[in-house]
Amino acid sequence: DKNTYKVSGGLHGVGVSCVNALSTVLHVTVHREGKIFEQEYHRGVPQYAVREIGATTDTGTTTHFKPDGEIFTETSYNREILAGRLRELAYLNRKIRITLTDEREKDEQGNVLSEPFYSEGGIMEFVQMLDRNGRRNSLLPAPIFIEAHDAPSNVAVEVSLQYNDSFSENIFSYVNNINTIEGGTHVAGFRRAITRVFKTYGDRNKLFEKSKIEVTGDDFREGLSAIVSVKVPEPQFEGQTKTKLGNSDVMGVVDSAVADVLNAYLEEHPKEARTVINKVVLAAQAREAARKARQLVQRKSVLTGSGLPGKLADCSENDPEKCELYLVEGDSAGGTAKQGRNRAFQAILPLRGKILNVEKAMEHKIYENEEIKNIFTALGVTIGTEEDDKALNLSKLRYHKLIIMTDADVDGSHIATLILTFVFRYMKALVEQGYVYIAQPPLYLVKKGKEQIYAWTEEQRKAAVATLAGGKEDSVTIQRY
């Protein structure tokens, strides 16, 4: 309904209908045309017709609803999830103030918890936050900001981008404030403009001549953080989940908007332009080195056949669906894990120390790393398929459960984070297919005589001592892992 909303994330107008059907109570108050209206529903059934209850100078709608406990097993809301989404909306809609109030908890002064979300700079601040949280150092003095409106299609475009010293691409895209995690035509238009504009600038100024390697679109996106946000009156999504935009005209609109601003920026900032081009050249050289390193990983697995890592304690089962691979830290942990495992379906691979931080390493260094090569070999995965020479090939995957099992202390948490980062960046298909798990080992074992209780937190440890010895720590044995 274009008379109600300029743009909307909804497609079918069933949002409030579904909430109503799934709530025990839903109450709506509308301030409109100088009047206040209300209506209440119980489990989707109206309790009375829409009625006028007063006068107002405001406009807007307030909706109260209570999830139906007979439908949902969990009806309490997670404040952190809501806060994350509202923070995102504040960045995407600059200068709009959003307040999250949680009346379930109070602060030390007895006040209800209330958190405001407001962004003066919008998606420029969003990009800066992404790099700050990722501990990436920016290469440009400030993010580049692009804002445009295409009159024929009535599509509005906002883009902010920043280059940093990392080796990965971080692009987040939105359509009418919906996160399109699979991208779509708006992201394709953005990438096309980035590649074309930088390539043209580099060729014109003879900045690629020394590299002796043909640069590709991927090279221009290494170390790029960006937010691409479009407002589309009639969005067409591929699939019901709204994760990929399909409007073909949006690609050209975004491409044109980004190219116009970027061309002007490069001409006005030659120093920054050269900084980015130098990074692109390095990315191309690293890509070529990584290609050779990937071929070595591929060739090694082909030539050596079943040459599994020497430290791998494999299982006897051959069916991948029944097999589990535990990644543990060090030989000592590997030893105890081997003693406690079920040999039939549980395999153990000890890793030596902290594995490489792939977020800060060049790609070819990753494929040359011994521990990472061992993970590839043990899993039986390789790089390259018939369709894509960089895609993960799972055709010979040996385990359908990859379990990261590190100590419960800070060090163990750090190692688990490093492994997860590697898996997410270079074996994402395993995550997407639900093959990756994190073990939850206890931090303490509290023992008295033949009774023992495992504890995962300090609070649980104290509770275990209270249970076994009435709180007397000197009468129990506490083992910290």
UniProtKB/Swiss-Prot annotation:
Keywords in alphabetical order: ATP-binding, Cytoplasm, DNA-binding, Isomerase, Magnesium, Metal-binding, Nucleotide-binding, Topoisomerase
GO BP terms in the entry: DNA topological change
Names of the cofactor(s): Mg(2+); Mn(2+); Ca(2+)
Catalyzed reactions per annotation: ATP-dependent breakage, passage and rejoining of double-stranded DNA
Family matches, as Gene3D superfamilies: 3.30.230.10, 3.40.50.670, Histidine kinase-like ATPase, C-terminal domain
GO cellular component, one term: cytoplasm
Domain Toprim as annotated: residue spans: 323-442
Residues holding Mg(2+) 1: 329, 407
Site, as annotated: Interaction with DNA: 354, 357
Gene Ontology MF: a single term: metal ion binding
InterPro entries in the record: HATPase_C_sf, Ribosomal_Su5_D2-typ_SF, Ribsml_uS5_D2-typ_fold_subgr, Topo_IIA, Topo_IIA-like_dom_sf, Topo_IIA_B, Topo_IIA_B_C, Topo_IIA_bsu_dom2
Residue positions binding Mg(2+) 2: 407, 409
Localization terms from the record: Cytoplasm
Keyword set includes Magnesium: yes
Cofactor note: Binds two Mg(2+) per subunit. The magnesium ions form salt bridges with both the protein and the DNA. Can also accept other divalent metal cations, such as Mn(2+) or Ca(2+).
PROSITE patterns on file: TOPOISOMERASE_II, TOPRIM
Family: Belongs to the type II topoisomerase GyrB family.
Oligomer and partners: Heterotetramer, composed of two GyrA and two GyrB chains. In the heterotetramer, GyrA contains the active site tyrosine that forms a transient covalent intermediate with DNA, while GyrB binds cofactors and catalyzes ATP hydrolysis.
Function field: A type II topoisomerase that negatively supercoils closed circular double-stranded (ds) DNA in an ATP-dependent manner to modulate DNA topology and maintain chromosomes in an underwound state. Negative supercoiling favors strand separation, and DNA replication, transcription, recombination and repair, all of which involve strand separation. Also able to catalyze the interconversion of other topological isomers of dsDNA rings, including catenanes and knotted rings. Type II topoisomerases break and join 2 DNA strands simultaneously in an ATP-dependent manner.
Record's protein name: DNA gyrase subunit B
Species annotation: Chitinophaga japonensis
This protein's encoding gene: gyrB
